[in-house]
Design a protein with these regions (language model features):
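Conserved N-terminal beta1-alpha1 strand-loop-helix module at the mouth
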Residues: 1-91, 107
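Conserved anion-binding
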Residues: 54, 79, 85-141
Length: 141
């Protein structure tokens, strides 16, 4: 998937909900009911950060809930991309945008919401073809 197509797919995902909850879930047992509650409340797009040991299991459980679109957040290495796909993630979110992560997502046909914090990073991603980006961290630098 080229950057243009990745951005088109990511844009479609982003348009499904007014906000995308960023979830840090420590217990996989609550994953399915949490996803069901969020989806029934009008938030079908869920980002599960890869910051806990249970994150991949959480993605796997949430991906089973009808009507949900589950992404893996805090992607920092190419192996994270592969693990996220194996867990059932529909998209990836990265806090930064290394060539390795972008190339792996492209090779694996996984839409990515690449992170950028500076104007240089944003311009570089635009030059590569990524028109949909995550401003991260969303605070004063």
């Amino acid at each position: 998937m080229d950057p243009y197509q990745a951005s088109k797919e990511t844009e479609k995902i982003c348009r499904l909900a007014p906000v995308i909850p960023v979830l840090v879930v420590h217990e996989s047992g609550i994953a399915k009911p949490l996803a069901e509650a969020l989806i029934s409340g009008g938030l079908p797009v869920l980002e599960v950060t890869l910051r806990t040991q249970s994150a991949l299991k959480v993605i796997s459980e949430m991906a089973k809930v009808p009507g949900g679109v589950v992404g893996a957040g805090t992607i920092t290495k190419s192996i994270d991309v592969k693990d996220a796909i194996n867990a059932g993630a529909n998209f990836a979110v990265s806090p930064g945008s290394t060539d390795d992560i972008l190339e792996t997502c492209a090779q694996q046909n996984l839409p990515i919401l690449p992170g950028a914090a500076t104007s240089t990073e944003i311009m570089r991603l635009f030059d590569l073809g990524y028109s949909v980006q995550k401003f991260f961290p969303a605070e004063a630098i």
